[in-house]
């Protein structure tokens, strides 16, 4: 955390990062508990949506988020968004998420209450390898590598699910198995027109390529270390918890904004049957999307919820990135508030 040269700086309870930034064990506890909250939301919200799901109304015209994603994965619903037979598959997914959230919560409590607050104090040699040193690029790249590999395997799970089980293809109105297409020329070309992609083979091919890049990059970061002397040109003095947080916020903010535009317009990854018709982009104080079909007052399609929520989350994540990036560079925001509060008593002296 930025202290502006004052080693005795204290933070209020609301500055949660201040309590874990330099204590890697507590840092892991916070991350595991946060993951548990996310997984709990997924399970609980699936049950909530299932309890409110109306089979007489098209799924795309209901304010749903979790159920349409399950439908695109070929779980629980037919091509018209109607429950197939019973709710057991959907209930099973929700319960697995709830149980997993309990395991993650227990892991968070374990790291918070019983295990060392700092991994440097751990009796396990492998655990000490993951002790965070913010201005040590070798430590950070080692930890980053493991994150990238885990993300790569998560992407592989999606690709293999589509290949073995199948996903919903709006082109034929049914769930089908999708073999990924590793045509590198196509993947390269879709960098500029990915919002218009209309072929599931290309979608899965892009994900397969992404998995390869993530796992290869992860292995590279684990195996390699800083070449030569660690200088200011390479980031010495810049690497900090605040800087890493700012970069993380920039990444997730950018992804959220891309997801907003993609979910608003693409009907292959976000089928009309499950998410509703494509949206119309409007501008006011900020951009926003509106439904292009007539719906009762206060009712919005899944697509409208997804696009707008992702965009505004992304927008504020980017603001958080700028805030923390400036703090990491040493900018003191208190100077701004002090300048504003003293504006009435400020004097201007003119010199000849």
Curated annotation (Swiss-Prot):
UniProt keyword annotations, A-Z: Chlorophyll, Chromophore, Membrane, Photosynthesis, Photosystem I, Photosystem II, Thylakoid, Transmembrane, Transmembrane helix
Membrane-spanning intervals of the chain: 27-47, 90-110, 142-162, 203-223, 243-263, 306-326
Membrane association type: Multi-pass membrane protein
Any one GO cellular component localisation term in the record: photosystem I
Family matches, as InterPro entries: PS_antenna-like, PS_II_antenna-like_sf
Record's note on what induces expression: As the light levels increase antenna complex levels decrease. Transcript expression level is unaffected by iron concentration.
Subcellular location: Cellular thylakoid membrane
Cofactor: divinyl chlorophyll a; divinyl chlorophyll b
Pfam families linked: PSII
GO biological process: photosynthetic electron transport chain
Protein name as it appears in the record: Divinyl chlorophyll a/b light-harvesting protein PcbA
Species of the source: Prochlorococcus marinus subsp. pastoris (strain CCMP1986 / NIES-2087 / MED4)
């Amino acid at each position: 955390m930025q202290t502006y040269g004052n080693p005795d700086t204290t933070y209020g309870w609301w500055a949660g990062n201040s309590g874990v930034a330099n204590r890697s064990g507590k840092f892991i506890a916070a991350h595991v508990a946060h993951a548990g909250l996310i997984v709990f939301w997924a399970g609980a919200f699936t049950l909530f949506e299932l309890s409110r799901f109306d089979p007489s109304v098209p799924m795309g015209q209901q304010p749903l988020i979790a159920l349409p994603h399950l439908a695109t994965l070929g779980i629980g619903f037919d091509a018209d968004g109607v429950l197939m037979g019973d709710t057991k598959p959907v209930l099973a997914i929700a319960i697995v998420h709830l149980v997993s959230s309990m395991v993650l919560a227990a892991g968070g409590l374990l790291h918070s209450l019983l295990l060392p607050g700092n991994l440097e104090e751990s009796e396990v040699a492998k655990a000490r390898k993951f002790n965070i040193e913010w201005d040590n690029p070798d430590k950070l790249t080692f930890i980053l590598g493991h994150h990238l590999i885990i993300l790569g395997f998560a992407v592989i799970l999606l690709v293999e699910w589509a290949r073995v089980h199948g996903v919903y293809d709006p082109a034929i109105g049914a769930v089908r198995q999708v073999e990924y297409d590793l045509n590198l020329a196509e993947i390269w070309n879709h960098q500029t027109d990915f919002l218009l992609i209309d072929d599931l083979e290309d979608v899965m091919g892009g994900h397969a390529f992404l998995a390869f890049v993530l796992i290869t990059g992860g292995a590279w970061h684990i195996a390699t270390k800083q070449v030569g002397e660690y200088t200011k040109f390479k980031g010495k003095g810049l690497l900090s918890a605040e800087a890493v947080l700012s970069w993380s916020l920039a990444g997730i903010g950018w992804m959220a904004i891309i997801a907003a535009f993609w979910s608003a317009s693409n009907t292959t990854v976000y089928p009309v049957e499950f998410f509703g018709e494509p949206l119309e982009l409007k501008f006011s104080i900020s951009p926003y999307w509106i439904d292009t079909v007539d719906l009762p007052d206060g009712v919005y399609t899944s697509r409208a919820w997804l696009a707008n929520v992702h965009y505004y989350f992304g927008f504020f994540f980017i603001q958080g990135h700028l805030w923390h990036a400036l703090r990491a560079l040493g900018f003191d925001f208190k100077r701004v508030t002090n300048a504003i509060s003293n504006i009435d008593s400020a004097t201007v002296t003119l010199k000849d």
